[in-house]
Amino acid sequence: MKTVKLPQGTLSIDANEFLIIDDKKNEPQYKAVSDFVGGMVEVVQFPNGDLLLLNEEGKLMGLPVNEKASKLWSETFTKDKYAFGHDDFVVGPAILIKKDALNTWAN
């Protein structure tokens, strides 16, 4: 388990950590997100405007499936609405920044 410093304090994280940010004052900077996900940050914009931040190379690194983030993914990107991506999954630590909490990441 590792620790990372985010605006809401220092967190101990494991591979299945799923953090939800819903306040602009808690929006993390890139370095903190990179530390949290353990590498390069991939940003996925959800149809409702929320952003999911995860490790871009997580699958190549063999990170374990993140059950909470994968559940959100499968509930959002359903087969009836999306030709691809509906059967995908999220691995490693992930952060969801709610649309109303976006500041820096929205640019």
Task: Show which residues each predicted segment covers.
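Short beta-rich binding modules
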Residues: 1-107
